[in-house]
UniProtKB/Swiss-Prot annotation:
Transmembrane segments: 10-30, 62-82, 91-111, 126-145, 152-174, 180-200, 220-240, 252-272, 286-306, 308-328, 340-360, 397-417
Native organism: Canis lupus familiaris
Keyword set includes Chaperone: no
MF (Gene Ontology): ammonium channel activity; carbon dioxide transmembrane transporter activity
Pfam families hit by this protein: Ammonium_transp
Family recorded in the similarity comment: Belongs to the ammonium transporter (TC 2.A.49) family. Rh subfamily.
Subunit details: Homotrimer.
The protein's name in its UniProt record: Ammonium transporter Rh type C
Catalysed reactions listed for this entry: NH4(+)(in) = NH4(+)(out); methylamine(out) = methylamine(in); CO2(out) = CO2(in)
Topological domain spans for side Extracellular: 31-61, 112-125, 175-179, 241-251, 307, 361-396
UniProt gene name: RHCG
Length: 460
């Protein structure tokens, strides 16, 4: 089938309509929160909170910076491994994230910070909006190279909506703990994206197989994304934790899990190659799986050795997934997972949910202390009668809710994106920047390098 990929009207109209709608909605509903609005100074004085240094900005902004870099630089560059899709990997990630954070501020605001007729926005809202967009970036990895920017905007519109509903169910109704988003961000984002790409299955994708591979410099750019993600993941998992020991624990647990994951990923990558060589795909992706898997239990008393075990297991599972599971999914289940998000986010997200459920079930006053247990899991108010074993069951329920929302939502959104007027590329043109970008002319070299006798001058 021949597709019309000309976006001259479709993309501008879609972008402008969405942005104008957001401007109107922000004007009607969004206002600054107490820490950003001088009108609340009297209330602060009544609460003896008059020091500017007590403003939430100074507690949260460093973490916000780190998370923001992960979303726009980390995820963007991680997907530049495709040899002729670098512009689109970074550029489309930039586009969907910029739209997604605005839409997320509205939807999450209606669910979590709606007060006296307005959504109150502060720095913590910005972090949560980035988390929401992180889930979209995960799903983007599954459809990378096979969809148009208009399709990505439509997918973001629906996914942010579904994410916000799922997050509200888990955090507000089930009261689960998921500081680093193993369930809400990674599991939901991965299986949503995998379901969408399953619906959008392309039987003729083999025609673009040559462009689906990497070259030396594209892998190097992708490794930059990996390093940014790896360095800032402790901030990601601890960004919205309660101040004090919980936030401190989240950073330590993530740090340890990531470190262990690198060694096992390298070990497995070498062991699985017949000549003992390393595969850059494994090093770019599997080394991050420990950060995903420790997310749910990040605030809990997992202990540093427990975090090392989680990272150790995920390095093995993720690397094996890239070697064996990804080809199986494509050949048998018609799931064309471009970036292998099932191995980096899907399976590690499920492992993280299980680790969180088990760790919560095993919690006791000997480990946390009486007040510490109450504070760590919020066993007060209407949760006074909840026990650690009950909390573990709610944690497990949260995993199934996330999976159900991802699968059902992915099917619906996939069907919408399959409509023929979104400007998607033909099978033979997938993974190609030139379809949507003005490309610079590549200069023809006429210089002979004497040290290499095989080189010939370019044809005129």
């Amino acid at each position: 089938m021949v597709w019309n990929t000309n976006l001259r009207w479709r993309l501008p109209v879609t972008c402008l309509l969405l942005q104008v709608a957001l401007v109107v909605l922000f004007g009607v509903f969004v206002r600054y929160d107490m820490d950003a609005d001088p009108h609340w100074i009297d209330k602060k004085e009544a609460e003896n909170s008059t020091s500017d240094m007590e403003n939430e900005f100074y507690y949260r902004y460093p973490s916000f910076q780190d998370v923001h870099v992960m979303i726009f630089v980390g995820f963007g560059f991680l997907m530049t491994f495709l040899q002729r899709y670098g512009y689109s990997s970074v550029g489309f990630n930039f586009l969907l994230a910029a739209f997604g954070i605005q839409w997320a501020l509205l939807l999450q605001g209606w669910f979590h910070s709606y007060y006296r007729g307005y959504i109150r926005v502060g720095v913590e809202n910005l972090i949560n909006a980035d988390f929401c967009v992180g889930s979209v970036c995960v799903a983007f990895g599954a459809v990378l190279g096979k969809v148009s920017p208009v399709q990505l905007l439509i997918m973001t519109l629906f996914q942010v909506t579904l994410f916000s509903v799922n997050e509200f169910i888990l955090l507000n109704l089930l009261e689960v703990k998921d500081a680093g988003g193993s369930m809400t961000i990674h599991t939901f984002g991965a299986y949503f994206g995998l379901t969408v790409t399953w619906i959008l299955y392309r039987p003729g994708l083999h025609q673009s197989k040559e462009r689906q591979s990497s070259v030396y410099h594209s892998d190097l750019f992708a490794m930059i994304g990996t390093l940014f993600l790896w360095m800032y993941w402790p901030s990601f998992n601890s960004a919205v934790s309660n101040h004090g020991d919980a936030q401190h624990r989240a950073a330590i647990n993530t740090y340890c899990s990531l470190a262990a994951c690198v060694l096992t990923s390298v070990a497995l990558s070498s062991a699985l190659h017949k000549k003992g060589k390393l595969d850059m795909v494994h090093i770019q992706n599997a080394t991050l799986a420990g950060g995903v898997a420790v997310g749910t239990a990040a605030e809990m008393m997992l202990m540093p050795y427990g975090s090392l075990i989680v990272g150790f297991i995920c390095g093995i599972v993720s690397t094996l997934g890239f070697v064996y599971l990804t080809p199986f999914l494509e050949s048998r289940l018609r799931v064309q997972d471009t970036c292998g998000i099932h191995n980096l986010h899907g399976i590690p997200g499920i492992i993280g949910a299980i680790v969180g459920a088990v760790t919560a079930s095993c919690a006791n006053t000997d480990v946390y202390g009486v007040n510490g247990l109450t504070q760590a899991f919020g066993f007060d108010g209407f949760k006074t009668n909840r026990t650690p074993s009950m909390q573990g069951k709610f944690q497990a329920a949260g995993l199934f809710v996330s999976l159900a929302m991802a699968l059902v939502g992915g099917i619906i959104v996939g069907i919408i994106l399959k409509l023929p007027f979104w400007g998607q590329p033909a099978d033979e043109n997938c993974f190609e920047d030139a379809i949507y970008w003005e490309m610079p002319e590549e200069p023809k070299s006429t210089v002979l390098h004497p040290e290499d006798s095989t080189l010939k001058p370019s044809e005129p």
